[in-house]
């Protein structure tokens, strides 16, 4: 079964069985297909896929790079660009990114810049990539440790979501995708929280429930992006929790995964929303805390300590260092004015006069961060 369930801002297909020749019908056999992935995915998932494509008559050029956020860099990007040239890849070729969010970001940036743009297809294999990274056309790489500092808007021709890939992942990788779904509930669709509350015990055991969950989240993100494809206003709401999260990832030198960073980032940014007077219901923080904890996700900076090398603790648990890193966030209009998404109530991000992000008072921001770091320093 192939279901084209999203067409705006780009096509997204839901695929129950990846090994279906109909799925590949839009790809020409006249030119090579360039598949971008990492070493792990290439070894664990790609052999049967490459055999299948070979039987369909495709010539596939496989380019891989080492897994992990630390390799989402300019050096990796240039290395892959050089390999495209060495392989004689031309405008007729199509780039396919297959894997998690890091791979899809790299594939998108490559496709958008090589020969000023070649066709791009995305095949997400993690929950985070399925409900977030593959939707919307954003891509990018890190520069000097700062998240997604270089990137473009480049919508894929198609996204193929095949949940059977999730079966190859350890449970913790499934859980790392949950914060993005909870974020969608915070900013746009309160029903997602209700869905998680009602179905959380069966989310990963019922195929029907999992499929509904994935589709719902994809449609939430697609609807937002369709209204603001270039991230001028409404789309910024998708960054809820990410301002703090990106600082966490930067200061941890890549030791904290994106999903765990977003989990803690949402808790901190919701506290800032409350302290700033934008959110009126303090119980919402308790609800968020309980929902994240049910899925064994962290809700405070303190819970990330065991994942960070000891020699980084002093730098990581320092409010001034976090504030300094926040100054480099892409949403900022200036380095001194940190901007972040505020939640008004469940299912609604604050419009902030149409900007959909605001600059919290420095004292509020500092005190919230200080309280997070203080707990660790006193233990």
Swiss-Prot record:
Keywords, ordered alphabetically: Amino-acid biosynthesis, Aromatic amino acid biosynthesis, Cobalt, Cytoplasm, Lyase, Metal-binding, NAD, Nucleotide-binding, Zinc
The protein's annotated pathway: Metabolic intermediate biosynthesis; chorismate biosynthesis; chorismate from D-erythrose 4-phosphate and phosphoenolpyruvate: step 2/7
Signal peptide range in chain numbering: none
Binding site for NAD(+): 67-72, 101-105, 125-126, 138, 147
Compartments reported by the entry: Cytoplasm
GO cellular component: cytoplasm
Main location: cytoplasm
Cofactor note: Binds 1 divalent metal cation per subunit. Can use either Co(2+) or Zn(2+).
Gene Ontology MF terms: 3-dehydroquinate synthase activity; metal ion binding; nucleotide binding
Catalytically driven reaction(s): 7-phospho-2-dehydro-3-deoxy-D-arabino-heptonate = 3-dehydroquinate + phosphate
Primary role: Catalyzes the conversion of 3-deoxy-D-arabino-heptulosonate 7-phosphate (DAHP) to dehydroquinate (DHQ).
Family from the record: Belongs to the sugar phosphate cyclases superfamily. Dehydroquinate synthase family.
Protein name (database record): 3-dehydroquinate synthase
Native source organism of the sequence: Chlamydia caviae (strain ATCC VR-813 / DSM 19441 / 03DC25 / GPIC) (Chlamydophila caviae)
